[in-house]
């Protein structure tokens, strides 16, 4: 898709378009990307909507990050026009007279960039608000494509701790259940602090819809991406799982069931390891 539609690749804040690769490398604003996602989601819904094993739809995976491409710039300007109505109101709200950063039109506004303006607090805050709204708009299109195909099961998407790139409380309004991925860095000297922080994260997830949530991902042994990742002590996995349930989780799920043969997360912990053991 990236070869046929280069616009689907994200542009970094320094205005460099990313090469194909890694993940989370797609523009939520791109019409081409949205259309292909709609087609895939509808096909999935048409195929599995009546399957007795499908009780919930997991929308995308760990929405995150942002794109600064021309499509997103124009969408951001339209978002600002809708909020402020005229450029004078924007200048007043952002106090752009400081350092003579006054805008003459919305067309002059660019998202925060290390090679441009990144010191205006109002600009940074509104950009973050826009990123959340644009992500929600994309997510809702994903949900609508399922509904249009006749899928009636509830939907969720997995959050990541107190991730600061998106307003999870706003996103939670558009899904039926909140779910999240919990990967505490256990086995440190400050073990009680890790337990306190994990408890707070569970409470945050429950508070978003004022009802039980789902623990979508947890690791039965040790993740592969933490700086120091020790194996869990005997009984710790059970304690962490019970902690989630005690704070309102209706599930304890693992990533991954079987360790991958290759790729970035081949050494990520799993229920079944490379040797077939558990």
Positions of the model-derived regions?
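Polysaccharide-binding and catalytic clefts of secreted carbohydrate-active enzymes
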Residues: 4-177, 181-200
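Hydrophobic targeting/anchoring helices
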Residues: 15-19, 156-278
